[in-house]
Each structure stands twice: as structure tokens, then as C-alpha cells.
């Protein structure tokens, strides 16, 4: 079984996975942003 959590916790590595630009780059990421907007989240993604 592979490790599932982010072991490298530097800011730049986290933003590559869950930053706004990273989310908007894929269809699934855009879906996440869409659902967070619908729910009324103040923070859509991790700020830069």
C-alpha cells in the first residue's frame, strides 16, 4: 500500500496540489471549486 498523505509539507508543494491555479487546471479541480462556490465557502482554495 502506498503512502497517501503529503510528506513534503513545504508551501510550494502544497500549492502545486491544492492551490487555486492547480485546481483550475483540471476538470475535477474545477468541479471542486464549483461545489465550494455553491456551498458558499469563503476560501475556495489555499491562498497564495
From Swiss-Prot:
Tell me the PROSITE patterns matching this sequence: RIBOSOMAL_L34
Kindly give the InterPro entries that the UniProt entry links to this protein. Answer: Ribosomal_bL34, Ribosomal_bL34_CS
Cite a single Pfam family from the UniProt record: Ribosomal_L34
User: Per the annotation, which location comes first and is thus the protein's main one?
Assistant: plastid
Q: List, in alphabetical order, the GO biological process terms annotated in this UniProt record.
A: translation
**Location of the protein in the cell:** Plastid, Chloroplast
Cellular component (GO) terms are: chloroplast; mitochondrial large ribosomal subunit
Keywords in alphabetical order: Chloroplast, Plastid, Ribonucleoprotein, Ribosomal protein
The record's GO molecular-function terms, alphabetically, read: structural constituent of ribosome
Q: Which family does it belong to?
A: Belongs to the bacterial ribosomal protein bL34 family.
Indicate what this protein is called per its UniProt record: Large ribosomal subunit protein bL34c
This protein's species is: Thalassiosira pseudonana
